């Protein structure tokens, strides 16, 4: 049996797209007969990330060496550029073990929005981390093209999926007539563009994050409902008239295809991530700089064509893409 070792700083109980991707792909790999070991922060002593208490990071990460040697994997994938990822990278290079990596987000843009650290600094760190990998997986064509322009090498496309048993359309979908946002409530998600947008329809926000309390006070007319999962989350998608995605820094956005699977059209900006998924007039609308205009057009999009556009995104395909990218240890 082939054994895959995944080293990741993002894992349950964190709630984000990276965790959804890695936990779901791990499950699919095991269903396909692979043995999968996952080294994650829960196996170490951790501390909450400053300004982000929802995320815990490992601090005794030097124990990683023992866990890698105990695993004896046939393939190694390093998922996140955190303490575990950096330590795993060092171990692999020191022992001449080829590995794959993944760029899940626009991390330099996130850091710039939150801490005002220059893009060149964080892009340089990312290139240092990923260009030593045999292959680096990226979510979309547009993001791949941006990364290649910035000097990243050996990039391989890796899509995303949704759980069709949970996310599916309702013939009466959109009946509640509200605008929906699902995701982290944080400045780097550009969520305030949605919160301050003028609309006759009420707004609902699903999720939590470092900016939640301040936005609850600033926008009392918005319904902040907290984290939702599974069928309860899917009901929010199905009942919404439109799913609004204001982010400028996402590389894909699993929430986008979850919304499509529920038949709910998308409104957002014409940037990497949304522009790789949204087809104008078919499953939503994008605008260069006016979110309200995108919402107005998206509200007229047919919910059936929206749902049909989601069918190419399956976790089985995502797992197959992951398998095809793996590089043998020996």
State where each predicted segment sits:
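Aromatic "clamp/platform" in nucleotide-sugar-dependent glycosyltransferases that forms part
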Residues: 248
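Short alpha-helical donor nucleotide-sugar binding micro-motif in glycosyltransferases
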Residues: 227-228, 235-240, 322
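Acidic anion/phosphate-binding donor-loop and adjacent secondary structure
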Residues: 162-177, 213-214
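Nucleotide-activated donor-binding/catalytic signature segment of Leloir-type glycosyltransferases, i.e.
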Residues: 213-231
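Short hydrophobic beta-strand element within catalytic cores of glycosyltransferases
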Residues: 265-268
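Donor nucleotide-sugar binding/catalytic pocket of nucleotide-sugar-dependent glycosyltransferases
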Residues: 124-169
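A charged, aromatic-enriched C-terminal amphipathic alpha-helix characteristic of glycosyltransferases
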Residues: 289, 300-328
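Conserved donor-binding/catalytic core segment of Leloir-type glycosyltransferases
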Residues: 171-206
């Amino acid at each position: 049996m082939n054994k895959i070792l995944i080293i990741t700083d993002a894992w349950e109980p964190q709630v984000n797209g990276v965790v959804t991707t890695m936990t779901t792909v791990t499950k699919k790999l095991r269903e396909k007969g692979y043995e999968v070991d996952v080294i994650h922060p829960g196996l170490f002593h951790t501390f909450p990330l400053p300004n982000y208490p929802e995320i815990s990071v490992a601090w005794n990460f030097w124990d990683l060496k023992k866990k890698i040697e105990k695993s004896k994997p046939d393939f190694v994938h390093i998922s996140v550029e955190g303490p575990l990822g950096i330590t795993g990278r060092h171990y692999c290079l020191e022992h001449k073990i080829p590995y794959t990596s993944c760029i899940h987000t626009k991390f330099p843009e996130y850091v710039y929005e939150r801490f005002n650290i220059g893009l060149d600094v964080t892009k340089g760190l990312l290139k240092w981390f990923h260009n030593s990998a045999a292959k680096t997986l990226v979510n979309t064509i547009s993001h791949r093209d941006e990364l290649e322009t910035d000097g990243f090498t050996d990039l391989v496309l890796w899509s995303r999926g949704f759980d069709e048993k949970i996310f599916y359309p309702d013939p009466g979908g959109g009946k509640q007539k509200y605008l929906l946002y699902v995701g982290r409530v944080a400045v780097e998600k550009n969520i305030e563009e949605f919160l301050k947008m003028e609309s006759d329809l009420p707004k609902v926000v699903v999720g939590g994050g470092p900016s939640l309390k301040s936005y609850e006070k600033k926008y009392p007319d918005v319904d902040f409902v907290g984290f939702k999962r599974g069928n309860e989350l899917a009901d929010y998608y199905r009942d919404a008239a439109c799913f609004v995605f204001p982010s400028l820094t996402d590389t894909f956005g699993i929430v986008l295809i979850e919304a499509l699977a529920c038949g709910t059209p998308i409104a957002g900006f014409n940037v990497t991530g949304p522009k790789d998924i949204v087809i104008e007039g078919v499953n939503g609308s994008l605008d260069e700089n006016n979110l309200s205009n995108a919402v107005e057009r998206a509200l007229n999009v047919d919910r059936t064509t929206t749902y049909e556009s989601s069918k190419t995104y399956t976790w089985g395909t995502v797992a197959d893409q992951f398998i095809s990218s793996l590089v043998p240890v020996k």
